[in-house]
Amino acid sequence: MNMSTATTTHSCVPILVFPSYWASFSCCWWTRLVTPMCILLTPTQCEDDEDENLYDDPLLLNNPEAARSSNSKTTTTLGLVVHAAADGVALGAAASTSQTSVQLIVFVAIMLHKAPAAFGLVSFLMHAGLERNRIRKHLLVFSLAAPVMSMVTYLGLSKSSKEALSEVNATGMAMLFSAGTFLYVATVHVLPEVGGIGHSHKPDATGGRGLSRLEVAALVLGCLIPLILSVGHQH
């Protein structure tokens, strides 16, 4: 009787954990699949040489606007890495619970948006004029953030910690944090760059265009809609 119970328990563990681990590794491979598509859209080798000469220009290296643009690219990548890391924490927390429905929801949510997010990151970096080698490095860091954090979260939690996280709904909190970072990066960094100074490639004297009232309203509305929809659905 004990042997049968132990066998059943051990056979259920892989079933519960498998979707989350499969999602974590699939996220990494999905993002890597974007790389060949982006390489096909990048300039030729001759244009790459021109880009390298452009980045080696001492006038541009000493230009504060060029430095600001470089910092913007790094900040955008860093924000999306934090977003992906939060996805990984949510994934690891979901895998540590016995709620199969939560695991499935997190799995589907991450699979649906990870590849478009990676493609958007690469498109933004290409639009900003970053060379292909640096784009690959940015993409690699972004693609590894979710699976690495999911495994660290799952393997680093003790049994008592998993129970405590389950009580405070750590998966939901991590997903909320992930969504917030994504909204912040998209609204504060990507949209102003693409919709404002990105078309002319000539920043104004103030160092770039700030957010308009409409953009701020859209950001606030995007934050409030999930809160409004969640009213009356507390479990």
UniProtKB/Swiss-Prot annotation:
Gene Ontology cellular-component annotations: mitochondrial membrane; mitochondrion; nucleus; perinuclear region of cytoplasm; plasma membrane; trans-Golgi network
Molecular function in Gene Ontology: androgen binding; G protein-coupled receptor activity; zinc efflux transmembrane transporter activity; zinc ion transmembrane transporter activity
Glycosylation-annotated residues: 2, 169
Parts of the chain that traverse the membrane: 11-31, 75-95, 104-124, 138-158, 172-192, 214-234
Assigned keywords, A-Z: Cell membrane, Cytoplasm, Glycoprotein, Golgi apparatus, Ion transport, Membrane, Mitochondrion, Nucleus, Transmembrane, Transmembrane helix, Transport, Zinc, Zinc transport
Membrane topology: Multi-pass membrane protein
Pfam families linked: Zip
GO biological process: bicellular tight junction assembly; intracellular zinc ion homeostasis; regulation of cellular response to testosterone stimulus; regulation of vascular endothelial cell proliferation; zinc ion transmembrane transport
Catalytic activity: Zn(2+)(in) = Zn(2+)(out)
Subcellular location(s) per record: Golgi apparatus, trans-Golgi network membrane; Cell membrane; Cytoplasm, Perinuclear region; Mitochondrion
Domain of life of the source: Eukaryota
Function: Transports zinc ions across cell and organelle membranes into the cytoplasm and regulates intracellular zinc homeostasis. Participates in the zinc ions efflux out of the secretory compartments. Regulates intracellular zinc level, resulting in the enhancement of AKT1 and MAPK3/MAPK1 (Erk1/2) phosphorylation in response to the BCR activation. Also functions as a membrane androgen receptor that mediates, through a G protein, the non-classical androgen signaling pathway, characterized by the activation of MAPK3/MAPK1 (Erk1/2) and transcription factors CREB1 or ATF1.
Family: Belongs to the ZIP transporter (TC 2.A.5) family.
This protein's name: Zinc transporter ZIP9
Species classification: Eukaryota, Metazoa, Chordata, Craniata, Vertebrata
